[in-house]
Amino acid sequence: FLLPRNSDEARAIKPLINYHFAGNLPVYAPSTADTGVNDPALNRDLAGLRILARPGRLQPETVPGAEASATPPGALYDLGADALALARRWWRMSSGTANASYGGLTGRVETGASGTLYRELRLAEFDRGVLREL
């Protein structure tokens, strides 16, 4: 695991892991390792790094309303859009139906038996500077 505070630290540490003959090991990091921009030149040092990413970040063109997700503040936009959509669906999702789900911009959101919300993100890996879903 790699626990950088930001993408600059991830860009500094990941090449060191590769240099010390550990490049074939899977390296996982929190989403803070991602700048939110698919820039091959900027992200080339992150090759092979795996993170959990929201659908709006991975495929903004295929997620309705995700146009604003391509920029770093897009995560906040996605969270607000999902909060509004969940508020509109809450009566249906909390009606006692276990595993009611909603596929939103921040991932698949499901309700458990107790009414607790669970969010599932997608595993992605940097490949030639671009974040791709695994």
Regions found by a protein language model. Name each.
Residues 1-134:
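Extracytosolic ligand-binding ectodomains
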